[in-house]
Structures are given as C-alpha cells and as structure tokens.
Amino acid sequence: MRVGLVCPYSFARPGGVQNHVLGLGGWLKEQGHDVSIIAPGQASRSLLAETGLVPSEFVSAGRAVPVTFNGSVARINFGVGPALKVKKWLDQGNFDVVHLHEPIAPTICLLALYLTDRPVTATFHTATPELTAIRFANRVLPRMVSRIDAAIAVSSEAADVAHHYSGVNPVVIGNGIHLADYPLVRATSRWRGGEHPLITFLGRYDEPRKGFEVLTAALPLVRATYPDLEVVVIGSGTARSVEGVRFLGGLDDEERNAWLGRSDIYIAPQTGRESFGIVLLEAMACGAPVVAANLRAFLDVLTDDEGLVGHTFRVGNSASASRAMLRSLSEPRDLRLERGRALAANYDWSVIGPQVVAMYTVAGQNYATSRGIKNRELKGH
C-alpha cells in the first residue's frame, strides 16, 4: 500500500503529533508499505532515522511560520505556495490512501483534503481548539468534511471535539509508542534512583498549561516530609532558577528514559488542552509511578480494569498535588509497576498500527461507496 502522511507541524520542534506521524510512518514501512510524509519545514536525517525512515520519504511543504495554537507555538504553513507543493506531492505519490493529521486547523492538511482525489483518513488530535480555529472550521469544514472517508481521534475527548465542530464520528485509536524503546526499571531499594526520592517533570515549563507553577507551589509541603527530595525538569524554556530544582534542558530519548526509569514520581501537572497522555504511558513503560492532574485525557490512559494506575489531583490545585505526591511516595515503589507496563503495552505500535491500517480499509470502502465506483483495492493489505 502507498500511504501519504500529512503532518501540519514542522519537525524542527518536537511534539506529540509529529512524533505520532514519524512513529506511524516507521511502523508502516516495517510492514512493507510505501510511505511518504509531507510537513512544513525540514526533517533531519537523524530524526527520520530514529523510526527507520530516510530523507527520500520526506517532502517539505515550504517554510514553517510560528503561530500560537492550543496554548503552544506551532510551526505551520498555508497558502498558495504550500498548496502547489502539496499538489505536486499528491500527483507524484499516487497514494492508495492519504492520512491527514489535525485537519481542524488551517494548515496543509486542509489543502491536501481539498486537493486529493484519493481515499482520505483523518486523525483528530485536538481536544480544545482555539476559538479562531473553531470559527475557521465552522466556515470551512462543513463544506469539506464529506471528503473524509474515515475518521480517527486519539482520545474520547478529541472525538467529542471533532464531532461537535465537524460532524464526524471518529473511532478512538490512541497514539503509539515503541515499547521496546522504554527499558523497564525495577526498584532495588526504598527509592528507585538512589538514596533520595526523585520527582521528574517533563515538558516546556514556560508554557502555563504545562503546570510547572502548580508543581513548584506544591513542593514545600512534600519537602516537609521528605527534606532530601530531588526534583529535575527535562525540557526547553528560558533560563531560570528555582530552589531545590535542577533544570536539565532538552535530552535525547535515551537520557530522558533513563531519568524516567529512576524516578519515584513522574509528575504531570498540566492545566488543560491535553488530548492524550503519551508521556504518562512512557513513564509507566519505564516503571515510574505517575501522579497527574485529573484531566480527562490523562484519566483515559491511567485507567485499567482495576481502576487508576497512579494518583491524581484536582487540576491547578497545588495543595491537592502535594497530597497526591505524598500518597505516592508513601507506597512501595513498584506497587503498580506491572499494571503500568501493561497499560503502556496496549499502545505499542504492534497494537495501534493494525488498527490504523484497518481504518485505511474503511476509507477505501467508503470512498468507493460515496463516489459510486468499484471499490479501490488497497495494495499490500
């Protein structure tokens, strides 16, 4: 099967959608499918190689422009120039299916949706779109949504947003991970990483929605019980100093996973606009206990048949966060380790990938039905 993946965001800055597209592309290639990715900006050879892709499998849609979207700075492009590049990519690709990611915002995904004449699968990632994007979607998507032959959402919340603003009824298929990339670390003493308890925060701490200020406000109460508490922050942001907190900056995946593996708590204090808790899964895959804000997207990935695999607290409430961290630290370190690893395994690409490919088949069938033509066979499936 020839699959065209359309990513709306530049790969110059890491993000959940970009990582998902790369992971999916790499998995599809492993299964013998032909893959091509188009996105704004450039993708480095080393970044592509992390998922088994090569530069010839990436096409640039032109220069990326930073805009504020969903509480973050997204690097996208849109307009005549990108449209011409997308049209050329579609014509040369001769794809069996075109897979758009985040089609609710004005990006190259909408251009591809308008320009393609092939079966279309669309994945909705956004749980809380910006007002401007909603207005745009209300004007444009109703006229174009019929071009989507199969719809996916990464979470139940993202599915609700997609249905409300575009009328589609997506199938929920979460983001994928390569479980083997996350070595499971078991506790060998009271604390997972050494002589002191360790709490790890991961993300762009300058963005208010990441909840770093909630964490710092919660720490004094935790330190009252654990004065030797160690706190590390992994992620980008302006240089700053917070007493008792180490800022490690951006780390490669191997280093980041090593820190997660030795963490006594992975803390996720985000205040909103999270559609999927991918980092919670990554932390659990490494064996780290999770303490998270009770966002709907986080509860979805933290829940198994027995209940919550971790501790949660009220969104934005530092006192509640303190109590949740204290409860977690009082427990045996590996109390929920096996359950967490099992939850993460549910999102391995060996599980997620076939679900996505099944939606490609649905797209082909719906494409044929809606256009009144003989069903287009998806080669290689």
From Swiss-Prot:
Its catalytic activity?
a 1,2-diacyl-sn-glycero-3-phospho-(1D-myo-inositol) + GDP-alpha-D-mannose = a 1,2-diacyl-sn-glycero-3-phospho-[alpha-D-mannopyranosyl-(1<->6)-D-myo-inositol] + GDP + H(+)
Q: In which pathway does it act?
A: Phospholipid metabolism; phosphatidylinositol metabolism
Read off the InterPro entries from this record.
Answer: Glyco_trans_4-like_N (IPR028098), Glycosyltransferase_grp1 (IPR050194)
According to its UniProt record, the EC number is 2.4.1.345
Q: Where is it located?
A: Cell membrane
Q: Which residues bind GDP-alpha-D-mannose?
A: 9, 16, 204, 209-210, 251-253, 256, 274-278, 282
Coiled-coil portions: none
Required cofactor names? Mg(2+)
Q: What topology does the record note for this protein and the membrane?
A: Peripheral membrane protein
Q: Which GO terms describe its cellular component?
A: plasma membrane
Q: Which residues bind a 1,2-diacyl-sn-glycero-3-phospho-(1D-myo-inositol)?
A: 18, 69-70, 75
Where is the site described as Important for catalytic activity found in this chain? Answer: 125
GO molecular function per UniProt = phosphatidylinositol alpha-mannosyltransferase activity
- CDD domains on file: GT4_PimA-like (cd03801)
Q: Does the keyword Lipid biosynthesis apply?
A: yes
Known function: Involved in the biosynthesis of phosphatidyl-myo-inositol mannosides (PIM) which are early precursors in the biosynthesis of lipomannans (LM) and lipoarabinomannans (LAM). Catalyzes the addition of a mannosyl residue from GDP-D-mannose (GDP-Man) to the position 2 of the carrier lipid phosphatidyl-myo-inositol (PI) to generate a phosphatidyl-myo-inositol bearing an alpha-1,2-linked mannose residue (PIM1).
Subunit comment: Monomer.
Similarity field: Belongs to the glycosyltransferase group 1 family. Glycosyltransferase 4 subfamily.
Return the protein name. Answer: Phosphatidyl-myo-inositol mannosyltransferase
Query: Organism, per UniProt?
Result: Propionibacterium freudenreichii subsp. shermanii (strain ATCC 9614 / DSM 4902 / CIP 103027 / NCIMB 8099 / CIRM-BIA1)
- Upper taxonomic classification of the species? Bacteria, Bacillati, Actinomycetota, Actinomycetes, Propionibacteriales
**Name of encoding gene:** pimA
